[in-house]
């Protein structure tokens, strides 16, 4: 019996990329165990494979990463398995050591350009530790996957490895019809903007989106998810008196989130070009907006802008500036004909950008392993 252990440091509830990996492995005949962590606010989890969410003494900082990797290492060392799948650099050390000691195959899926995230770029000593781990292990890896070609090229240039690309395009999901706005306590007479994501962190444009609402009295901004910018967003909305224009909804199951997104008029992805990770990012939310049939307002980052411009499914801004965001929103809603065209193009783009093709590519990479 083929057995795969898939590990990630989040709480498993909203990581659609990891869920897809587990589904593909299960379809290939693996018995799957997905390992993550349990947080106080973690949503309930129901999956057709085994899951383990570890309760840790530490929830952040170096002690969290040390505790998680130590516990993960011993779990991997003594659990029956034929294949290990490591998601992101913060699980790689435990997976690499266990794979080496046990002679097991290892797949590394890096969801971002990890050592270039702003949280590390702004803390050189911490970044040096992660970079040392990456430099020691990455050149030895045989099976590496990432989320887009820009990041694949950057890793190939840095380490020489061949890196496969599987984009974060969601597989088509059968969702029930979207509820009416009233059922979600949303106003009928306002244009609704949405920004969603599990990583609504600093430098991702959420603060600027909130400030833009000062100039958009006829709009409502929904921010769905979580991240380290959340307390800042709450404070901004409160201090600027924008609670009636900005609703922070927190994390929720995917289907519920898409109920809100499908009731929105415009999706926001406003990452700043302040670090290589954000520059090369291709966030899940872009594809969720397209699957919801709504146009996109995006910053001019290569991977995102290539889709928005190439599919003519939204508006690209030079940078995430509150005044520019507000002006773009006003201009878009003032031109019903242009808005309708962008909305139609978003629906067409969702059909063309087929998550099933990405799942098939992942299957071809994993087939024969373990």
Q: What are these regions, as identified by a protein language model?
A:
Residues 310-311, 315-322, 331-337:
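Conserved acidic donor-binding segment of nucleotide-sugar-dependent glycosyltransferases
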Residues 36, 131-177, 247-249:
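Donor nucleotide-sugar binding/catalytic pocket of nucleotide-sugar-dependent glycosyltransferases
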Residues 43, 125, 175-187:
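A short helix/loop element that forms part of the nucleotide-sugar donor recognition site in Leloir-type
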Residues 70-78, 93, 97-101, 108, ...:
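Membrane-proximal helix-turn-helix segments that form the acceptor-binding/catalytic region
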Residues 6-7, 145, 187-214, 222, ...:
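Conserved donor-binding/catalytic core segment of Leloir-type glycosyltransferases
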Residues 266-269, 288-298:
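Short hydrophobic beta-strand element within catalytic cores of glycosyltransferases
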Residues 324, 331, 338-352:
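A short, well-ordered alpha-helix in the C-terminal region of glycosyltransferases
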Residues 232-259, 263-266:
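Nucleotide-activated donor-binding/catalytic signature segment of Leloir-type glycosyltransferases, i.e.
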């Amino acid at each position: 019996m083929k057995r795969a252990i898939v590990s990630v440091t989040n709480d498993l509830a909203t990581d659609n990329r990891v869920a897809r990996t587990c589904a593909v492995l299960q379809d290939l005949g693996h018995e799957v165990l997905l390992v993550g962590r349990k947080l106080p606010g973690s949503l309930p989890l129901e999956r057709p494979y085994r899951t383990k969410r570890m309760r840790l003494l530490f929830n952040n900082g170096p002690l969290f990463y040390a505790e998680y990797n130590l516990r993960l290492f011993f779990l991997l060392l003594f659990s029956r398995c034929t294949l290990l799948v490591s998601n992101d650099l913060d699980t790689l050390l435990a997976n690499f050591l266990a794979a080496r000691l046990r002679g097991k195959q290892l797949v590394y899926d890096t969801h971002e350009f990890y050592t270039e995230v702003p949280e590390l770029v702004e803390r050189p000593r911490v970044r040096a530790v992660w970079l040392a781990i990456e430099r020691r292990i990455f050149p030895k890896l045989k099976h590496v996957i990432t989320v887009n070609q820009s990041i694949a090229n950057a890793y190939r240039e840095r380490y020489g490895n061949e890196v496969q690309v599987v984009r974060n395009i969601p597989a088509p999901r059968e969702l029930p019809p979207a509820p009416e706005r009233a059922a979600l306590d949303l106003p009928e007479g306002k244009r609704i903007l949405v920004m969603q994501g599990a990583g609504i962190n600093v430098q991702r444009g959420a603060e600027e989106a909130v400030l833009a609402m000062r100039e958009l009295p006829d709009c409502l901004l929904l921010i769905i998810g979580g991240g380290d910018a959340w307390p800042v967003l709450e404070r901004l909305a409160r201090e600027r008196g924008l609670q009636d224009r900005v609703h922070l909804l927190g994390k929720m199951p995917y289907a519920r989130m898409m109920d809100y997104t499908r009731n929105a008029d415009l999706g926001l992805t406003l990452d700043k070009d302040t670090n290589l990770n954000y520059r090369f990012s291709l966030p899940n939310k872009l594809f969720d907006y397209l699957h919801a049939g709504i146009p996109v307002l995006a910053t001019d980052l290569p991977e995102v802008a290539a889709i928005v411009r190439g599919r003519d499914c939204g508006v690209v801004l030079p940078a995430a500036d509150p005044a520019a965001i507000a002006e773009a929103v006003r201009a878009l809603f003032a031109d019903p004909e242009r808005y309708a065209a962008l909305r139609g193009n978003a629906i067409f783009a969702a059909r063309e950008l087929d998550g099933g093709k990405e799942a098939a590519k992942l299957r071809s990479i994993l087939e024969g392993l373990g």
